[in-house]
């Protein structure tokens, strides 16, 4: 029976990895163009940017289609960006530690859903400096399910953890803005901190902020070295990396 779950998990991982390409490409553009909360990010089928032909379902099979088509459009031989293949492959590979660290099939799919959200938030924020509400808000729902599945994290600790993360991030930004007249984090960062706080509990929120601050500083330092005019960096990736370290440290304890 375990092999059935593993096969199902692999198939879902491949599908989510492929769908991540849609989310990463379309969602930031929809936000910038429409500035609206709810929208259908997959309202139109994918098409070749050169010849305009719709991409058929059999040319959208994760990983396999790219290899069989040699990274080209079936109709006009236009090169397909390697980034699509890399996103699918990296998502698929990184998904497997989640399966092996999960306690049962419900836990594995909850963690896979969380991974899908954080993976997309990481890439979108890194590329576009955006943390869409459409991806951040579902983390709260997953946190609720996760609490029911994991007795080590109580409902009280989850709620207080989210509240504490919100207060710390909001007050920190308010103080810096008061004296420096700049925002060190955006509203999306505060929401992400809050959502993640509900997943780790109040006891581990300080570690989240400590780690994310260190990682963000390292990121900022190298960004400044490579580009002296780069004043801002996306904070989301630092928050997500810190969460992964804290979260799986808790699970391995």
From Swiss-Prot:
Its EC number(s): 3.4.23.43, 2.1.1.-
| Presence of the UniProt keyword Chloroplast in the record | no
Provide the alphabetized UniProt keywords. Cell inner membrane, Cell membrane, Hydrolase, Membrane, Metal-binding, Methyltransferase, Multifunctional enzyme, Protease, S-adenosyl-L-methionine, Transferase, Transmembrane, Transmembrane helix, Zinc
* Gene3D superfamilies reported for this sequence: 1.20.120.1220
**Which residues does the annotation say bind Zn(2+)?**
48, 51, 73, 76
Query: Catalysed reaction per UniProt?
Result: Typically cleaves a -Gly-|-Phe- bond to release an N-terminal, basic peptide of 5-8 residues from type IV prepilin, and then N-methylates the new N-terminal amino group, the methyl donor being S-adenosyl-L-methionine
A cellular component annotation (GO) from this entry: plasma membrane
Q: Which GO annotations describe the biological process of this protein?
A: methylation; signal peptide processing
Names of the cofactor(s): Zn(2+)
The cellular location(s) given in this protein's UniProt record come to: Cell inner membrane
Q: Which residues cross the membrane?
A: 4-24, 80-100, 106-126, 129-149, 159-179, 198-218, 230-250
Q: State the family named in the UniProt similarity comment for this chain.
A: Belongs to the peptidase A24 family.
Which PANTHER family is this protein grouped with?
PREPILIN LEADER PEPTIDASE_N-METHYLTRANSFERASE-RELATED, TYPE 4 PREPILIN-LIKE PROTEINS LEADER PEPTIDE-PROCESSING ENZYME
Its protein name is Prepilin leader peptidase/N-methyltransferase
Q: Which organism is it from?
A: Vibrio cholerae serotype O1 (strain ATCC 39541 / Classical Ogawa 395 / O395)
């Amino acid at each position: 029976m375990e092999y059935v779950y593993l096969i199902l998990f692999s198939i879902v991982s491949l599908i989510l990895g492929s769908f991540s390409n849609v989310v990463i490409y379309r969602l930031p553009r929809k936000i910038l163009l429409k500035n609206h909360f709810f929208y259908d990010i997959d309202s139109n089928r994918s098409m070749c940017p050169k010849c305009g032909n719709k991409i058929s379902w059999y040319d959208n099979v994760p990983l396999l289609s790219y290899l069989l088509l040699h990274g080209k459009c079936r109709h006009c031989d236009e090169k397909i960006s390697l980034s699509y293949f890399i996103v699918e492959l990296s998502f698929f590979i990184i998904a497997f530690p989640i399966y092996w660290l999960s306690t049962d099939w419900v836990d594995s799919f909850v963690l896979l859903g969380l991974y899908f959200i954080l993976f997309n938030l990481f890439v979108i924020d890194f590329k576009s400096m955006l943390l869409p509400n459409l991806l951040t808000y579902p983390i709260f729902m997953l946190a609720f399910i996760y609490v029911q599945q994991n007795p080590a994290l109580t409902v009280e600790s989850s709620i207080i953890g989210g509240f504490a993360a919100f207060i710390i991030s909001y007050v920190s930004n308010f103080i810096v803005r008061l004296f420096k007249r700049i925002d060190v984090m955006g509203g999306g960062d505060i929401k992400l901190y809050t959502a993640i706080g509900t997943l780790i509990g109040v006891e581990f929120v300080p570690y989240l902020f400590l780690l994310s601050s260190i990682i963000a500083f390292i990121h900022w330092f190298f960004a400044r070295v490579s580009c002296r005019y780069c004043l801002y960096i996306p904070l989301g990736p630092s928050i997500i990396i810190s969460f992964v370290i804290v979260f799986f440290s808790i699970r391995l304890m």
